[in-house]
Amino acid sequence: MGKRDRADRDKKKSRKRHYEDEEDDEEDAPGNDPQEAVPSAAGKQVDESGTKVDEYGAKDYRLQMPLKDDHTSRPLWVAPDGHIFLEAFSPVYKYAQDFLVAIAEPVCRPTHVHEYKLTAYSLYAAVSVGLQTSDITEYLRKLSKTGVPDGIMQFIKLCTVSYGKVKLVLKHNRYFVESSHPDVIQHLLQDPVIRECRLRNSEGEATELITETFTSKSAISKTAEGSGGPSTSRVTDPQGKSDIPMDLFDFYEQMDKDEEEEEETQTVSFEVKQEMIEELQKRCIHLEYPLLAEYDFRNDSVNPDINIDLKPTAVLRPYQEKSLRKMFGNGRARSGVIVLPCGAGKSLVGVTAACTVRKRCLVLGNSAVSVEQWKAQFKMWSTIDDSQICRFTSDAKDKPIGCSVAISTYSMLGHTTKRSWEAERVMEWLKTQEWGLMILDEVHTIPAKMFRRVLTIVQAHCKLGLTATLVREDDKIVDLNFLIGPKLYEANWMELQNNGYIAKVQCAEVWCPMSPEFYREYVAIKTKKRILLYTMNPNKFRACQFLIKFHERRNDKIIVFADNVFALKEYAIRLNKPYIYGPTSQGERMQILQNFKHNPKINTIFISKVGDTSFDLPEANVLIQISSHGGSRRQEAQRLGRVLRAKKGMVAEEYNAFFYSLVSQDTQEMAYSTKRQRFLVDQGYSFKVITKLAGMEEEDLAFSTKEEQQQLLQKVLAATDLDAEEEVVAGEFGSRSSQASRRFGTMSSMSGADDTVYMEYHSSRSKAPSKHVHPLFKRFRK
């Protein structure tokens, strides 16, 4: 018996392990497909084997990096491990910053010194927007205070030598592999797989190589406002120009001129079979020549132009214009990702891209609210007629006849179960269309399986990803490089804040001591109910109520965020405020949001995690967070974005928006809060710690007596373990609502006896006399 029991236990364990592995696979971000092809250079790291390390772990770079004589006038130094440090107070800061944003990933950008890191993907992005290997190495040498280490030079050459030399171009609805390097084309054609992909004529012979000369000019014309050099908050002192080494200044001017000039380029191309495109892309990646996707929309005569233009009132800000110039730099549309802070006008960038391409456009958001907002943005900024915009959500399915711009959600397109007849017809129409541009809003949220499904369902010539936070806790964000394209542009948050393009936010972490009764239970309980105890901490409730009262007296508009629905309802109902969460209908949501925007009596609303992204509330200037999703950096930044929109009529020098994160002291929440702040601290924000709110004792606040606090504690303890869990949003990516989850709990909880009380009732025996019953039926009486 013992052997059989052991075998059963082992079988159960292996089944459990297999199940957990499956769960982990589901959580994987883009790129968990084993067939995903990635160039081997993408996995390369900078070699720093020759670096000396002392007994304290400090690295000694003196022998590898001798200082230049005029090092004080040069703004950066490059470490042998690929990290680049930039002096933000240098006279040539603006030139160096523009260059570094193009070639490296920002790591941390506080006030005085910025840190960047060279990666294979950042160098791919640099090549994709037109920078040559020689440009990158030469300008890096000129900007550096020291000699650039040989390992860095080799790394740059390795990552840029082949990338960007071959392009997949769609012209007249035919696919061509194109390059300005004839030797590369000949090298590719020697490969048997690529020869198979090449189009052949009716006699079975390969079509001829096409040699042509074309003039490349940006599709986005530079405005007078945007032409004054790089956009920056730093104003260079004209007298400081003498401090700038001439070789630096001349070289930057030359690079700027090269970008502006119309260039004549001679290219060699061959036509390929459309059905072999995916095979061709994979093979080119294995040969270390990844294909850059470009769309020659001006010469696409097969897909009709749509009647859309920007309104004269739509004025692009310098950073928006710059991001679009990276996308349309050579007169064609490049696929890629643009990173702008929340509230910095990502929607206008998307609408302008659609107006530039002027082909059928598909926009994908992550909620029905974002669909409505994208429709409003198209109507606000462009001349498109309302009848040409078609929405496809669970609530609104517009007829697609004559539609030029379709707006939907990822979950609607990736839906695999049975659809209604009407939805099936719309899906068929979406699949048969050839889309010129696909705009992917909040592109960081998309897991691999769903993302691949969306990409295979609809055919689009150009893909533009928009996001504010290109971070994921699983570090799989880099796979977007080959699913969509490289990062084309990333803005500096502090720079936009200093220029008044986004609000100036005061970030604060408010420490709320746990009441003794709550803390005693918190220490004793080991289940998920601990989350409920530190969220429902009466001192946190009082701090929240005090901040709401304080800001309502200033006529501020306040959003309170809570991931936990039990806490959200308790707070909102007790404070008599409207709240929005998953089950709230679309009509009720829009009504609450409209009241919040326009009704002076509704100054505070409570929102669950459904409002993390795509809720456009420019009036809000105070955000209070009472519970959150663990240590998610992305969620913290997205929530801050709800109050980042520039405020009208406010002085830019003063703080005009406030972000409070309420944290229960001596609990797990403290550690989570520190983790969550990392992304914003790297962007240059600082968090002020408040241990005591001045004037809180004078206010008449809830839970001021021990009896009230005890009643609240009993209510929390009576709640189920399910109440302690975060909200699962229907249709949310990465949500595992359909899967089983493992929870700790008591036996009574598992038997459904959480709120059940055993009670006895003594009923009186004296009953009313029953009616006369026939003797025959008495036998069947129970």
From Swiss-Prot:
Pfam families: ERCC3_RAD25_C (PF16203), Helicase_C_3 (PF13625), ResIII (PF04851). ATP-dependent 3'-5' DNA helicase/translocase; binds dsDNA rather than ssDNA, unzipping it in a translocase rather than classical helicase activity. Component of the general transcription and DNA repair factor IIH (TFIIH) core complex. When complexed to CDK-activating kinase (CAK), involved in RNA transcription by RNA polymerase II. The ATPase activity of XPB/ERCC3, but not its helicase activity, is required for DNA opening; it may wrap around the damaged DNA wedging it open, causing localized melting and twisting that allows XPD/ERCC2 helicase to anchor. It comes from the Eukaryota. The keyword Magnesium does not apply. Belongs to the helicase family. RAD25/XPB subfamily. It is found in: Nucleus. It catalyses: Couples ATP hydrolysis with the unwinding of duplex DNA by translocating in the 3'-5' direction; ATP + H2O = ADP + phosphate + H(+). It comes from Macaca fascicularis. Residues 542-702 form the Helicase C-terminal domain. Its EC number is 5.6.2.4. GO terms for biological process: apoptotic process; DNA repair; DNA topological change; embryonic organ development; hair cell differentiation; nucleotide-excision repair; protein localization; regulation of mitotic cell cycle phase transition. Component of the 7-subunit TFIIH core complex composed of XPB/ERCC3, XPD/ERCC2, GTF2H1, GTF2H2, GTF2H3, GTF2H4 and GTF2H5, which is active in NER. The core complex associates with the 3-subunit CDK-activating kinase (CAK) module composed of CCNH/cyclin H, CDK7 and MNAT1 to form the 10-subunit holoenzyme (holo-TFIIH) active in transcription. Interacts with PUF60. Interacts with ATF7IP. Interacts with KAT2A; leading to KAT2A recruitment to promoters and acetylation of histones. Residues 1-11 have a biased composition (Basic and acidic residues). This is General transcription and DNA repair factor IIH helicase/translocase subunit XPB. The gene is ERCC3. ATP binds at residues 340-347. Keywords: ATP-binding, DNA damage, DNA repair, DNA-binding, Helicase, Hydrolase, Isomerase, Nucleotide-binding, Nucleus, Phosphoprotein, Transcription, Transcription regulation. A motif (Nuclear localization signal) lies at residues 6-18. GO terms for molecular function: 3'-5' DNA helicase activity; ATP binding; ATP hydrolysis activity; DNA binding. A motif (DEVH box) lies at residues 441-444. InterPro entries: ATP-dep_DNA_Helicase, ERCC3_RAD25_C, Helicase/UvrB_N, Helicase_ATP-bd, Helicase_C-like, P-loop_NTPase, XPB/Ssl2, XPB/Ssl2_N. GO terms for cellular component: nucleotide-excision repair factor 3 complex; transcription factor TFIIH core complex; transcription factor TFIIH holo complex; transcription preinitiation complex. Its main location: nucleus. The modification Phosphoserine is found at residues 686, 751. Phosphorylation on Ser-751 by CK2 controls the 5'-excision activity of ERCC1-XPF endonuclease; phosphorylated protein inhibits the excision activity and thus NER. ATPase activity is stimulated by TFIIH subunit p52 (GTF2H4). DNA translocase activity by this subunit in TFIIH is stimulated by XPA, ERCC5/XPG and XFP plus ERCC1. Phosphorylation on Ser-751 by CK2 controls the 5'-excision activity of ERCC1-XPF endonuclease; phosphorylated protein inhibits the excision activity and thus NER. Dephosphorylation reactivates the 5'-excision step. Phosphorylation has no effect on transcription or the 3'-5' helicase activity.
